[in-house]
């Protein structure tokens, strides 16, 4: 009994170590491919549109209603302590520091991460990845590099736009539903907002973009055989990306705002 338990733990530990090593080598190969030609500008532009532009409606809707709900809930709580004047500040700081980057990251992970994993996984199953080797093409450079670069570039842009739209959602609720004075609300919005609040959110966005793209590409690149393998790769990409987004969000927050 004890021998079986020890054997099971040993196998899982070895499997985990192998996965970490394989992922580290894969990530290093993707990063070092940046300095090697060709740069595949056409593929990068295509991924910029796919990851950035086509994700904008989802991110905009998410952040808009998050800002609106945040203003509404803050009013419900702060009115008990006659602190309604702090609502605008809470909305803008919550969005720029935390909600904007995290919500955008989770939405992009669900939309883009699943698509990338399914695309590369299907190419692996249908032996298109092997065909790239026969054509003397670096498959990681061709498949992974454009997606990673595009995700790192577009995520901060999406978060910045999402922050503005989220603050707008809070403004509309605050002014037109809660009857705040427009100029007073705007003054409170920017009174305590500092550059570090926005910068920290943009740094998070860039890190989230790298996490989403590299994990999704890795999951698809090493997907199992058949439709079941592609399905597992897709699920793994979304779940692992989401978990690492939340973990890295805490670590970056700790780095920028040491308490």
From Swiss-Prot:
GO molecular function per UniProt: phospholipid transporter activity
Main localisation: membrane
Keyword Transmembrane set for record: yes
Keywords: Cell inner membrane, Cell membrane, Membrane, Transmembrane, Transmembrane helix, Transport
Function: Could be part of an ABC transporter complex.
Family: Belongs to the MlaE permease family.
Stored PANTHER family: ABC TRANSPORTER PERMEASE PROTEIN-RELATED (PTHR30188), PROTEIN TRIGALACTOSYLDIACYLGLYCEROL 1, CHLOROPLASTIC (PTHR30188:SF4)
Protein name: Probable ABC transporter permease protein RBE_1340
Source organism of the structure: Rickettsia bellii (strain RML369-C)
Phylogenetic lineage: Bacteria, Pseudomonadati, Pseudomonadota, Alphaproteobacteria, Rickettsiales
